[in-house]
A protein has these predicted regions:
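Structured alpha/beta reader/binder surfaces that contact nucleic acids or chromatin modification marks
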Residues: 1-127
Length: 127
């Protein structure tokens, strides 16, 4: 199964369905179900902004699953701002073109699975 790694707290917010758009600098042709991996790296500014204790969140593990059903492209900063309540990013993108992965059917796993993350979508065989 495909998997994508996100920094915390964004991995958690995606897994519980609060975050329904994932912004990336690259496009993908992949569509379908995927696993959500929480990176060992934490975005401290975002944790502070969302009042999340960085020590209370899972790191370095697969924590959820979701479905990527479409990809669209932001051509300017205005597009990015209009969807702020969906991607929950607090930073300003440094690229003029941002690809946004539209996500649905997110769910946390009952038990986390320790796993080393990688860049981009990567294959995971849990069996």
């Amino acid at each position: 199964m495909k998997c994508i790694s996100l920094k915390q707290p964004y991995a958690e917010m995606l897994a519980v369905g609060k975050k329904i758009i994932e912004c990336r600098k690259w496009c993908t042709k992949f569509r379908g179900d995927f696993l959500i991996h929480a990176s060992k790296n934490v975005d401290i500014k975002s944790c502070n902004y969302y009042n999340i204790d960085e020590n209370s969140i899972i790191k370095g593990a697969i924590i959820g699953k979701a479905n990527l059903y479409d990809v669209k492209k932001y051509l300017n900063y205005k597009d990015f701002l209009l969807d702020a309540n969906k991607h929950l990013s607090i930073g300003i993108p440094d690229d003029k073109t941002i690809y946004v992965f539209l996500i649905k059917d997110a769910a946390k796993l009952e038990q986390m699975i320790p796993y080393k993350g990688k860049l981009g979508f990567f294959d995971v065989n849990l069996y």
